UniProtKB/Swiss-Prot annotation:
Positions contributing to GTP 1 binding: 9-16, 56-60, 118-121
Protein name per Swiss-Prot or TrEMBL: GTPase Der
SUPFAM superfamilies, A to Z: P-loop containing nucleoside triphosphate hydrolases
Cysteine-cysteine disulfides: none
Domain of life of the organism encoding this protein: Bacteria
Keyword Thylakoid in annotation: no
Organism: Aliivibrio fischeri (strain ATCC 700601 / ES114)
Residues that, per the record, bind GTP 2: 217-224, 264-268, 329-332
Claim: Iron-sulfur is one of the keywords in the record: no
Amino acid composition bias (Basic residues), ranges on this chain: 486-500
Pfam family, one: KH_dom-like
Region (Disordered): 468-500
Lineage: Bacteria, Pseudomonadati, Pseudomonadota, Gammaproteobacteria, Vibrionales
Subunit structure: Associates with the 50S ribosomal subunit.
Amino acid sequence: MIPVVALVGRPNVGKSTLFNRLTRTRDALVADFPGLTRDRKYGRAKLEEQEFILIDTGGIDGTEQGVETKMAEQSLAAIEEADVVLFMVDGRAGLTSADEAIAKHLRSREKPTFLVVNKIDGIDADAASAEFWQLGMNKVYQIAASHGRGVTSLLELALAPFMEELVEESLKDENGEITDLTEFEDFEDEEKDLTEEDAEKDFARLQDQPIKLAIIGRPNVGKSTLTNRILGEERVVVYDMPGTTRDSIYIPMEREGQEYVLIDTAGVRRRGRINETVEKFSVIKTLKAVEDANVVLLVIDARENISDQDLSLLGFALNAGRSLVIAVNKWDGLDNDVKEKVKSELDRRLGFVDFARIHFISALHGTGVGHLYESVQEAYVSATKRVGTSVLTRIMKMAQDDHQPPLVRGRRVKLKYAHAGGYNPPLIVIHGNQVKELPSSYKRFLMNYYRKSLEIMGTPIRIQFQNSENPFEDRGGKLTMSQERQRKRLLGAVKNRNKK
């Protein structure tokens, strides 16, 4: 499972700075959807090949009545369910009572915790860090998040148990030592250029696998009811798969010869046990399920307006590149006028995901639930459809003929060829001159052109642009011997003509 890293600390210690640095956007057109509100509390990040989920728990002030009462419920849940906690303090401001309250809470939890002293650039780092020994965390790590110094080294240590290769011995330290991570050189990796071989490996990995379907949604939209309806219809024996309390339950099932794995984020067990009226909602459990799924089924309550939380969950699914089906639940019993208003609101708020099928269902009565499978299969097939280089290049040239790329610094951008770079989501790699300089509007045009031409439905498309190398770039303007001889002949001919 993808690890979860929680940023914990009082306000203004640099959590947002570190969060923004680690969740930076990439060159690939991932979630450039107008109207999508980006959530600032959680996001996806990557260290080398290791992906992880980053949670900003928000500022915690435990100075008045203790950390238990002042911590938000969701922040507590994030700490409980995270795999690693980065406890951030301000090296310039020094130790505060809020830091002590948070440290007391963290010490009571058996959780890998890294005490991170931030903002140590330009000051005596060791002197600034000395007083934080009082927090009893055994180790102190120094970084400067605003400049990125020490950040990569910190993550290598924090994520070492989850990475294939161990951290370099030089980075390891014993208990009771301060580790100034800013002395190690940090650098930001460019996004890896994807090849056709990468796409083939991706395609082979997806073959003969069941479709992993995650049902997500905010509390009380009917996830539990829908999950039970799906399982009840198929008469599958529901049982708890091995796992920890913070992991979702994976339930194998089959319908019309197609194998599925239902990823249960709502805590559903045997039907007889479902007696809670309020679902326990876990952001982390939901994000993990999205990362592991092939298709995401987002459940929305028809009787309530689309909320920011709905859009946040939707945004995370899009950024993860997952296929998407939307189920508007509790549709039965609504007046026609109300239904029209709901549809109008959906068009207005969700117009940027027009590739996703929307179903109006009643999980309680089963109305429309059967049709969800059709869209789930359609979305998965679209996300894993194998397309050759010749087809992708031909579509690219057709798009170029219909709408020429713009000029960049006085030169026309040239698109040369395209090939597949991956599947689920479908990723198309376009090579050419100055292609990374293309404006977002033209990139979006290409994405929509590919979607229409390939008849892709139910999944986002990613496009990566790679500038082709100039074979004459390193010649420094020097002529070859043949060109030099030709030049001399031309110059000689010009001189002779002038003499006459």
